[in-house]
């Protein structure tokens, strides 16, 4: 009986550890987690390959959403047309580990980014856009890759 109790205890502990490993699991795919951006973010593509457009008129704030990534990496593409301000994308894997952090500043001569995140844990990821004094428009797309 002692071994059965010990085994049951280990199973319960294992299940608790496994379910606590997904920091963003409580959110549905493409569900908005935070939106303090005073401009506009329009999500035009959802599912496993989210994408959309954003506009601002000197606006600032954060826009983040949950994204179901079945792979270990993500490909991010985004571009801006803006003389001022900046756009920063941060990707966190299901455990909350930052796997990509990229910023483009308006008027810097660099207006687009295309790259791959470092490896992370598959599951529900968090996609964060931080827009600062953003005056213009832009678009983004994200795809899961191995």
Enumerate the predicted regions with their spans:
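Short proline/glycine-enriched turn/loop motifs at strand-loop junctions of beta-rich domains
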Residues: 71, 81-86, 134-135
